[in-house]
Structures are given as C-alpha cells and as structure tokens.
C-alpha cells in the first residue's frame, strides 16, 4: 500500500533546472508502491530571492529571452502559494514531508515549514531535510525545531528504509545516513551507507512536475530539457570548493 510522501522544493523563479534528485527519488519510491507529490515554488511569487535568469538578462550576461518565455506562456502563477500548499496537504494527506534544499534555498524552505507548522504538529507528520546544504551543514539544519531528521549524503537507500519503517509504524532511529531528533535533540547520528550505484537507478520521474518546469532559457531561446545524471561528485580538488569532500 505504501505511504504518501510530499517533497517540498523551495526554489525561486528563474532557477529553472528540474531537480534530478527529487525526480529520481519519486521513481524509486513509486517502485516501492509509495505515492509521491511535490510542492514546487518555482513559478510562485514568493517575494524571496531573485529571478536568477532575469537578472542575468538585465545585466547583459545572456541573450534576452523574456519574449520567448511569453510565447511559451511561462509566467508567475496567479494563485497564492500558501493557499495552494494547504489545499495540497488536505487532499494528499502526506505521511512524510521531505524538504530538499541548497544553502540559498534553505531560508525559504524554513519559511514554508513555518507556514504549515500547525498542520504538521496536529497530524504528527515527520519532516526530513536533505540535499546539498543539509549534507554539508547537518548541525545547522538539525537545530530548527520543525526538522525531525536530516539526511547526510545520498538519499536513495535512506528514503526507502525510512518509508518502510513509517509504513510499518516502526522506530526509524537506525536508518543509515540519517541524523534523527527526539524531543528537540539529536539522539542518533547514523553511519553513512556505501555509495549508491547510480547505474541501477530508474529513469527520473519527470511526470511529478508541471510541464512548464521542463523549459529553460538558453542562448536567447526557450528549450524543453531535463537533466541527466552521469556522475556524482567531482574529480577536481579546487581549494575553494567542498565537492572533493564528496569523493
């Protein structure tokens, strides 16, 4: 039967690359009979951050593409993200909320969780934080009272194990890659699992996202595209970058 998993992707307009991790997790979870949805803020007017691609256009860093976006009808939604999210929660009734974020997305992610704090607490829904920022700053991410677990590293195996334990109403303190909190304090920092063989991952589930998320500006035109993951980490060892730590 499985459980309902709602991914929260606190993205800002202009950062249009579809997140391959969430699309991969969706495909894997569906293979294990779980139901998956995503709340993606990319096309909402959230009054947060900047329009990345738009600012590049204004700064003459890229060929203007605004008219091309209008032709594709790629515009900010005219609905309120708070209303839409609460409606999705009531209809989907998630058993797990999974926040995926980079450092620049983290504050918006927390803002979203604050907005649904009452619903989360009333229905006792656990929140898992994962992604680049939680992986490299689990101490910071785990401090927030609305975060129940932090995934450090790859999430494929951790998500499968966690969802199975939630479905069976079992304790999830021993799920690898997870830092788990109880009563507001970290009670378990589990070990990191062996690297995932990405060649065994299924094709990403792009159906999880609205079609407009497949469009992205390039050279002044708007193209339909999606990312393909061929490797994780980076073979280079630049002093200013944290990627070598992943290898």
Kindly give the residue locations of the regions a language model identified.
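Residues that mark the start of a beta-strand
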Residues: 2-5, 35, 224-227
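Nucleotide-activated donor-dependent transferases that construct or modify glycoconjugates
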Residues: 3-14
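Core AdoMet radical
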Residues: 13-14, 95-105, 225, 229, ...
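Glycine- and acidic-residue-enriched helix-capping/strand-helix junction motifs
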Residues: 13-22
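Glycine-rich, highly charged phosphate/nucleotide-binding loops
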Residues: 47-89
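Radical SAM [4Fe-4S] cluster-binding motif and immediate context
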Residues: 199-247
């Amino acid at each position: 039967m499985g459980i309902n998993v709602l991914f929260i992707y606190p993205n800002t307009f202009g950062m249009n690359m579809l997140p391959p991790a969430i699309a991969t997790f969706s495909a894997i979870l569906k293979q294990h009979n779980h139901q998956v949805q995503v709340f993606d803020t990319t096309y909402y007017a959230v009054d947060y951050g900047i329009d990345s691609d738009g600012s590049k256009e204004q700064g003459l860093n890229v060929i203007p593409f605004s008219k091309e976006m209008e032709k594709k009808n790629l515009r900010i939604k005219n609905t309120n993200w708070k209303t839409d999210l609460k409606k999705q929660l009531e209809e989907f009734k998630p058993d797990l909320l999974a926040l995926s974020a980079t450092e620049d997305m983290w504050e918006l992610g927390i803002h979203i969780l604050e907005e649904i704090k009452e619903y989360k607490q009333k229905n006792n829904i656990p929140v898992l934080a994962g992604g680049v920022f939680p992986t490299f700053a689990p101490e910071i991410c785990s401090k927030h009272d609305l975060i129940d677990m932090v995934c450090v590293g790859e999430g494929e195996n951790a998500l499968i194990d966690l969802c199975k334990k939630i479905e069976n109403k079992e304790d999830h303190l021993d799920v690898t890659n997870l830092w788990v909190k109880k009563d507001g304090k970290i009670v378990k920092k589990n070990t990191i699992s062996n690297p995932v063989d990405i060649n065994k991952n299924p094709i990403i589930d792009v159906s999880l996202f609205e079609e407009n998320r497949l469009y992205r500006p390039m050279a002044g035109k708007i193209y339909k595209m999606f990312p393909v993951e061929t490797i994780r980490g980076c073979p280079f060892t630049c002093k200013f970058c944290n990627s070598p730590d992943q290898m």
